[in-house]
Amino acid sequence: MSAVEWSILPGLSPYRETLEAMENRVAAIRAGEAAEAIWLLEHPPLYTAGTSARPEDLVEPERFPVHVAGRGGQYTYHGPGQRVAYVMLDLDRRGRDVRRFVTALEDWVIATLAEFNVRGERREGRVGVWVVRPDRPAGLDGSPREDKIAAIGVKLRRWVSFHGLSINVEPNLTHFEGIVPCGIREHGVTSLVDLGLPVTMQDLDAALLRTFPQHFPD
């Protein structure tokens, strides 16, 4: 099976049930019983802890439910207005190179943002995608402010990927204040709407679909 099956889930998907369904799909892909898949969805407000999460980075543990995700990375927030893309691809077929896979995810996000004339950038030592904010006050050292617009955290099981990425369309950015996102204190978070772009979830989904084959060819 080579065609990637796309699903756009309506409403807010409960985290635990979605994680269980994702694990079942990964097992089916590994067994050759199901096609690779990408699920586009939103979660209710919650925090997830990756395998590198530090307790001190959970600033407000009572604010929202906290889930141990099992993916790489640290703490992140999911909630309404944020598009989560769960990416279940067979790297045994596509190439057993985890770093290349994460780079391809970043490139996919960067290409998607470019569809809206947003320049997303990667930073050494900071997984995810960032935007420079010349409209905001510079840092204490005079460097321009940079805000995170997309987070990436993945896990592999027998070379099938799961978890994936999240892109901020129009979430409540104050909800990120309950954590230190991805363990990075010196930078903020932003969204497409925060950047002044009236982008809808449907607009973003269409851009994700258009740009995907450039970075993950069959």
Swiss-Prot record:
Catalytic residues in the record: C182
GO molecular function, one term: lipoyl(octanoyl) transferase activity
Protein name per Swiss-Prot or TrEMBL: Octanoyltransferase
One family name in Pfam for this protein: LplA-B_cat
HAMAP family: LipB
Alphabetical list of CDD domains matching this protein: LipB (cd16444)
Site label Lowers pKa of active site Cys, positions: K148
Subcellular location: Cytoplasm
Cysteine pairs bridged by disulfides in the record: none
Pathway: Protein modification; protein lipoylation via endogenous pathway; protein N(6)-(lipoyl)lysine from octanoyl-[acyl-carrier-protein]: step 1/2
PANTHER family for this protein: LIPOYLTRANSFERASE 2, MITOCHONDRIAL-RELATED (PTHR10993:SF7), OCTANOYLTRANSFERASE (PTHR10993)
A cellular component term, taken from the record's GO annotations: cytoplasm
Reaction catalysed by this enzyme: octanoyl-[ACP] + L-lysyl-[protein] = N(6)-octanoyl-L-lysyl-[protein] + holo-[ACP] + H(+)
EC nos: 2.3.1.181
InterPro entries per UniProt: aa-tRNA-synth_II/BPL/LPL, BPL_LPL_catalytic, Octanoyltransferase, Octanoyltransferase_CS
Anything else known: In the reaction, the free carboxyl group of octanoic acid is attached via an amide linkage to the epsilon-amino group of a specific lysine residue of lipoyl domains of lipoate-dependent enzymes.
Alphabetized UniProt keyword annotations: Acyltransferase, Cytoplasm, Transferase
Domain BPL/LPL catalytic positions: 32-218
Gene3D superfamilies: Bira Bifunctional Protein, Domain 2
Positions that bind substrate: R71, G72, G73, Q74, Y75, T76, Y77, H78, A151, I152, G153, G164, L165, S166
Catalytic class of the enzyme: transferase
Protein function: Catalyzes the transfer of endogenously produced octanoic acid from octanoyl-acyl-carrier-protein onto the lipoyl domains of lipoate-dependent enzymes. Lipoyl-ACP can also act as a substrate although octanoyl-ACP is likely to be the physiological substrate.
UniProt similarity note: Belongs to the LipB family.
